[in-house]
Amino acid sequence: MEQQQSKNIVHVSKLFVCTAVDCKDDIEEKFERSFVTLQMQISGLSDKEMHDMLSQAVCKDKQHEEISIGFLYIMLTDPSMAPKTYRDVTLVSRDGMNGIVTNLTFLVAEKYTKLTEVARRQLIWLLREFVKHQVLSVENVIWNCLRQAGGGDVSSRNLFLIESLLDIFIEFRTWLEGNPFLVQSTVYSFVRLIEDHANPALMSLRQKEVKFTISLIRERFHDIIPLGRDFVRLLQNVARIPEFEQLWRDLIFNPKILHQTFNGIWQLLHIRTSRRFLQCRLLPEMERKISFLASSVKFGNQKRYQDWFQEKYFATPESHSLRSDLIRFIINVIHPTNDMLCSDIIPRWAIIGWLISSCTNPIASANAKLSLFYDWLFFDPAKDNIMNIEPGILVMYHSIRNHPFVSSTLLDFLCRITKNFFVKHEDKIRIGVYNSLKLILEKQVIPNLQPLFESPKLDRELRNLIRDNFREFLSPSANLGQLLYPSMHPAQGYIIKKESDQRILHCENMDLHETGLINTSGSNISMLDEDIKISLVPTDLEIESVFSDETAENLKRVHNIEENTDDDDDLPLSKVRLKEKPRVELAESIAESFDAFVTKRNSYTWEAFLKDFRPLPASAFEEFQLNYVISNTVLILRETLPQQNIFSESKTEEKHLAKSISYPLYGLFRFLYENDEKSKKPFQILLSEICEGIPEIGYLLLYFMKIYCKLQTRKNSQHSYQFKTTIYRQICDAVDEKIGNCLIRDLDLLEKENTNIFLWLLPDIYREFKSIATNNTDLLRITLRCIDAKNVRDILYSVAQGKLTIFKQDGLIDCIRESLDFETYEQFCLWQIVQAHDVPLRCIQDLLPELEAGSHPEALSHFLLLLKNEEPTNEIIRLMLSRETKSKGDPFVTSALRFWCQRYEEKLSEIIASLLTSKYPSSSPNKRKRPPKGISVSTSTPSADQVLNHLEHYRRSCRHGTGTGLYVHDMMQRALQSAYSHSNDSTKKQFSDLFALAAEEDTTVGRRGGSGRGRKQPGSKKDVSNHGTSKKNAEMVKTIYSSDENSSEEDWSKSKMTQTAKRRKKANNDSD
C-alpha cells in the first residue's frame, strides 16, 4: 500500500538540475528515494516521537544510511530547516556523521555540476558547520570542493565557490594548519587560481587570496617544500605580484628565512610533485573526459572528441591557462600500459600536440611548452620516470614530417629554455636535458635523433642552435655538413632577417636576470611562434635588400630553380651543384658512357659505364678526373633513390619486385653479381666512395639479392640463382670493416627502416651467413626487439620446416648467457625459438648454477619445464645442488625434486645419497674412495653444506608425509648417517631435524664379524631385513610429518637425538 502511494507522488527534485532529456542515474534516484522515505516516516510526528522512532530505525545499517542521506537532502535543499535538521542528525547519528560525510564527498566529486544554486550555497553552510564542530573526514569533502574550483574559469558560480572556501580557510585557520596535506593542496590550488584573477574587477578577491596564501606559505613552509618543482612553475606565473616578488627574492637569496632546513630553490626543483596535486587542478569531469580520450579513443577517430572538448573547456580567453594543467596531468598521471602502447589507442604525444598546436594565446603557448619540457630540465635517471619525458620527444619526432612547424617551435623552445631558465644553474639544467636524451636513446623510445635534429625542414638558425646545444647527439657528417654547407636550401642564405629572431624570452617588471631565473608569466613572455612562417621563396623586398646586383642575380637564379621543385627535399641544391661543376675531359673509353649516364640517369647507362670503367687501371686517370667521376656518380646514385617506399609493396608480384630494384644503385649490384673477376684500383675506390656516401648500401644489397635470385629463378627454373656472399664481402672490404660488424650494422639499420623486410630476409641471412649469424647475440637481439606474436609464429614455422636455423648446439650456452639481460618478452620469445630447435638439455644445463631467482625468472621458468621431461641424472643433480641456497631456500630446486620424486624417487634418492657420501672420507682406511659412477669432477661440484641445505629445504616443503620417501631408502639413510658422523657441532645443530630422519646405524664390527668371507647369507633373510629396515624408516619419517598440530617437531627431534646418542653409546660398549 505504501509503495503504491509513493509511486503516485509526483516529486520534482530540489537537489539536482534536470532537463527533459536527462535520465536519472542511480545516485540521483538514491538521494530522491531516501528523502521521500524519510518524509513518509517523520511526517506528522512531534520532535520527541521522531527522535524515538529514528533512534530505533538507525540500529539497522540499511535504514541508517537511508535516514542519513534523507537528512543530507533536507540540509542541502531547505535553508530554513537546515539548522534544525543538523541538530536532529547529531542526536540520531551513531557513526559520528561518517555516513553523511561519505555521501557528501561522493556527491561533490560526482554530481557537483548538477547541483542547484540553493544546494551549492547550502553545501558551503554545511561545510562551515562540519569544520566548526570538527567532524571527522570533512577534509575529504573540502579537497573535492577545491577540485571543483576550476582554473581558467571566472564565472560567478566558480568565483562564489572559491571565495567561500577561502573564507572558511581564513576563519578556521587553526583547523586547516592541523592537516598538512590540505595545507599543501590549498596553497597549490590558490597559487594557480590567483593567475586567473588579474581582471581589475576581481582585485579585492585577488588581494584576499594573495594575503592568505603568502601568510600560509611563510608560516607553514615546511609543509610547502614537498610540493616540489610544479609549485615553482606556478610561482613563476604570479611573480609580478609584489608579495610574490618578495617571496621569490627570499627563495633565491635568503632561503633560511623561510625554514632552517630549506637550502634554496634548487631543492624544490629536484622534488617531483605528487600526482595528487596535479590531479587537484583538474575538474573531476574534465579528468574523466581526458582519461577516456587517452584510453578508449582510436587514433584517427579523435577529432570529434577534441572538438567537443575544445568547445566545452576552451571557449573563453581565460581558459587557455588550462592547457598547462592538462599537459602536466597527462605527462605525470596518465601512464599507459604496454598493451595500450601496442594498441591503436591515441597516444599521449598526439593529445599534447593537439593542445599545443590549437593554442592561440602566446603566453599560454609558452607555458604549455614549458609544461611539456619541465621534467627534462631536472631529470635524474635514478629517481625520475622515463614516461615523464617520453611525450616531449615523441611529439617532435612524429610531427617533423607532416607538421614541421610544431617540431621546429618546440625544438627552438627547448634550446632557449635550457640556457635561459635558470642562468645560475645552467650547467645542471644541461645535464638534466642531456640525461633525458641519453635515456630516450638507451630505452629506444625513438631509434635515433638524426631525423629530428638534422631534418632539412628546420631553418638554418635553428639548426645552428641545435648544433650549439646538442652537438654530442649529432652525427659527425652533420657537423661536417654544417661547416661545408651552412644552408640546406640556397634561398635561405640570402634572407637577411626572419621572424624567428623574435623568439626570445623577455622579462619585465621584476629583474630576474639578477636572480638567474626567467619569468614565464603574464605579459613577461613574448613568444611569436604562431606567426613564424619562413618562406623559401624570397620576396621582391628581400631581393632589393641584398648588397649587389651580382648577388641579386644569383638569388633570382636560385629562385627560378626552386619554383619547379619540391621545397621539402634537397634535390634542387644538388642539381645546382652538379650543373655548376666544370666539365672535365675523360678518357675516350668511358667519356661517352659517362655522359650518357649523367644525362639519362638510369640503370642501363650506369651498367654500360661500369663495364667500360672496371678494367681501367689507375694510370688511366689523373686525380682530379677520378674525383670528378666519383663525386658525380655518388650524387646521381643518391638522388635517384626514392625518398619513400624504397621497398616493394608486394613480396610476390613480379611487377612490384622488379620495379623496386630498377634504380641505378641496384644496377651496380647486378653488375657485381654477373661479373666475378677482380677489379682494378679505380673501381675499388669508386665502390668505397659509394659505400661512404650511401650508408644504406649494405641492406639494399641484401634486399637486391633476395629479389634478383627470386626473379631469375622464376625466369629460368632449370638454373637456381643463389645469394653471392662474395659481393657483400666486397662491400665490407670497401669500407675496411669485418663482415660480421657490417652485417649486424646493416641489419640494424634495415630493421629500423622496415621491420617486415628485415623479417622477410632473415631466413636468407641465417642460411647464407651461417657462420656469422648462427648463435649471434647481436642479431638475435635485433630480431627479438621487433617481433610480435605473429612473427614468432612464422619464425617457429620456418624452423620446424627446416628453412631457418638460428641456433646450433656448440656455443649456444654462451648466446643464452648473454641474453639473460634481455627484456622479459624478448626472453620468452627466445626460449620458444630455442625449444623449436630441439636443443637437448645437456647443451645448456651448465647454466643452472648461474641463474638467480630474482634476476633470471624467465630462464628458470623454461628450465623447470625442460626438467619435467627429463629423468634425473648424476650430472643434472650435481649442477642443481650447486646452486646457492638462500635463507628461504631455492624454490627451483625444491620444485624439481618434488616432481621427480613422484616418478623416480629411488633413483633420485640414490643419486643425491652418492653425491652426499662423496663429500666425506671413506670409513675404511685401507680402501681408496672411488668417485660414484656418473659423477664427474667439476668446478660446479656442490659442497656438503650445499647438499644438506637443499635437503633441509626440501624436507621443510614436505607436508603430511608427501615426498618424504626420498629419505627412507638405504643409501640415503647411510649418507645422512655418514654426514652426521663427520659434521661438527654447529652443522649438527643446524641440520638436526634432517639428521633425525636417519635410522640408527647398526654397529659395523658386529655386522661384519658375523659373516665369513666365503659364506653367503641367505637371500630371503637379507630381503626380509632390508624390507624391515625400509619399513621402519618409512614409518619413522611418516611419524614426523603426520603428527598433529599440537606436537612440536623440535621436541621430537631433541628426544630422537637423545635416544640416538644413548643407542650409539651402548653399541660402542658392546663393540668394545
UniProtKB/Swiss-Prot annotation:
**Region Disordered: start and end of each range?**
920-943, 1002-1072
- On this chain, the residues bearing Phosphoserine are S1042, S1043, S1047, S1048
* InterPro entries, per the entry: HEAT_Ints3_C (IPR056518), INTS3 (IPR045334), INTS3_N (IPR019333)
Q: What is one Pfam family matched by this protein? A: Ints3_N
The record's subcellular locations are:
Nucleus; Cytoplasm
**Keyword Cytoplasm (UniProt):** yes
> Could you give one GO CC term from the UniProt record?
nucleus
Work out whether the entry's keyword set contains Nucleus. yes
- Cysteine pairs bridged by disulfides in the record: none
Q: Which UniProt keywords apply?
A: Cytoplasm, Nucleus, Phosphoprotein
Q: Which PANTHER family match?
A: INTEGRATOR COMPLEX SUBUNIT 3 (PTHR13587:SF7)
Assembly and partners are described as:
Belongs to the multiprotein complex Integrator, at least composed of IntS1, IntS2, IntS3, IntS4, omd/IntS5, IntS6, defl/IntS7, IntS8, IntS9, IntS10, IntS11, IntS12, asun/IntS13, IntS14 and IntS15. The core complex associates with protein phosphatase 2A subunits mts/PP2A and Pp2A-29B, to form the Integrator-PP2A (INTAC) complex.
- Function summary: Component of the integrator complex, a multiprotein complex that terminates RNA polymerase II (Pol II) transcription in the promoter-proximal region of genes. The integrator complex provides a quality checkpoint during transcription elongation by driving premature transcription termination of transcripts that are unfavorably configured for transcriptional elongation: the complex terminates transcription by (1) catalyzing dephosphorylation of the C-terminal domain (CTD) of Pol II subunit Polr2A/Rbp1 and Spt5, and (2) degrading the exiting nascent RNA transcript via endonuclease activity.
The family note in this entry says:
Belongs to the Integrator subunit 3 family.
User: What's this protein's name?
Assistant: Integrator complex subunit 3 homolog
Originating species: Drosophila yakuba (Fruit fly)
